[in-house]
Amino acid sequence: VEWTDFERATIKDIFSKLEYDVVGPATLARCLVVYPWTQRYFGKFGNLYNATAIAENAMVSKHGTTILHGLDRAVKNMDDIKNTYAELSVLHSEKLHVDPDNFKLLADCLTIVVAARFGSAFTGEVQAAFEKFMAVVVSSLGRQYH
């Protein structure tokens, strides 16, 4: 993947401004509410019966924050995201048996949450850079499935 200077700077800027403990939980909660079939991967998280229960679930919050911090690895290794996530791809495919389509759903939810947080600063150009970055992450996480 070729990154422009603008794309690199934009991705680093976005992640430097994110409140991980807010955006991560909001992203995972949104995914679990909008795409309820994704809840099957989180059976040990307890009460996921409705949007309020999901939003208030401490395990959802913790894992959402963990996911967002996991993206730091991609931000720091933008030239080698596929290898950066090789082990994580194996874990999700072989041990956790996560449908790789769910990575895209989560990425879409993150894009929505980030757009809402950034407001008018999340211009079309910024969104294009962010979605390109997330597409590379999604592809890398799904790599083991191919």
Swiss-Prot record:
Tissue expression pattern: Red blood cells.
Listed Pfam families: Globin
One GO MF term: heme binding
PROSITE patterns per record: GLOBIN (PS01033)
Residues annotated as domain Globin: 2-146
Residue numbers binding heme b: H63, H92
Alphabetical UniProt keywords: Heme, Iron, Metal-binding, Oxygen transport, Transport
Coiled-coil annotated spans: none
UniProt xrefs under CDD domains: Hb-beta-like
GO process terms (BP): hydrogen peroxide catabolic process
Cellular component, GO, one term: blood microparticle
SUPFAM superfamilies, sorted: Globin-like (SSF46458)
Extra remark: This fish has three hemoglobins: Hb1 (major) and two minor hemoglobins (about 1-2% of the total).
Summary of subunit composition and partner proteins: HbC is a heterotetramer of two alpha chains and two beta-C chains.
Family the UniProt entry places it in: Belongs to the globin family.
Function description: Involved in oxygen transport from gills to the various peripheral tissues.
Protein name in the entry: Hemoglobin subunit beta-C
The organism of origin for this protein: Trematomus bernacchii (Emerald rockcod)
